[in-house]
């Protein structure tokens, strides 16, 4: 039994998100929640909400036991970038790219 969740267009760079995701891949859900709760990274808060949503979906839709769930697959893909212009001296402008990412997470029974 597997439950998948997807979060798209998150205002987080894929590179910074992968630092957090690589720590929880393959862990049991309760260990992953503890790790994400005490992580100082911005991506940890976003991924924690996504993980809790996946656990709630597995419990409600599939009737899964929370103690037996583990993070089966989790990966981050690069999303579209928001393009902005920053004013510079002498009437010029610089282009600023604000990256987004897509997070895919799957939990399953052991």
From Swiss-Prot:
This protein binds specifically to 23S rRNA; its binding is stimulated by other ribosomal proteins, e.g. L4, L17, and L20. It is important during the early stages of 50S assembly. It makes multiple contacts with different domains of the 23S rRNA in the assembled 50S subunit and ribosome. The globular domain of the protein is located near the polypeptide exit tunnel on the outside of the subunit, while an extended beta-hairpin is found that lines the wall of the exit tunnel in the center of the 70S ribosome. One of its GO terms (cellular component) is cytosolic large ribosomal subunit. Belongs to the universal ribosomal protein uL22 family. SUPFAM superfamilies: Ribosomal protein L22. Keywords: Ribonucleoprotein, Ribosomal protein, RNA-binding, rRNA-binding. Coiled coil: none annotated. PANTHER family: CHLOROPLAST 50S RIBOSOMAL PROTEIN L22-RELATED, LARGE RIBOSOMAL SUBUNIT PROTEIN UL22M. This is Large ribosomal subunit protein uL22. Part of the 50S ribosomal subunit. The keyword Ribosomal protein applies. InterPro entries: Ribosomal_uL22 (IPR001063), Ribosomal_uL22_bac/chlpt-type (IPR005727), Ribosomal_uL22_bac/org-type (IPR047867), Ribosomal_uL22_CS (IPR018260), Ribosomal_uL22_sf (IPR036394). Pfam families: Ribosomal_L22 (PF00237).
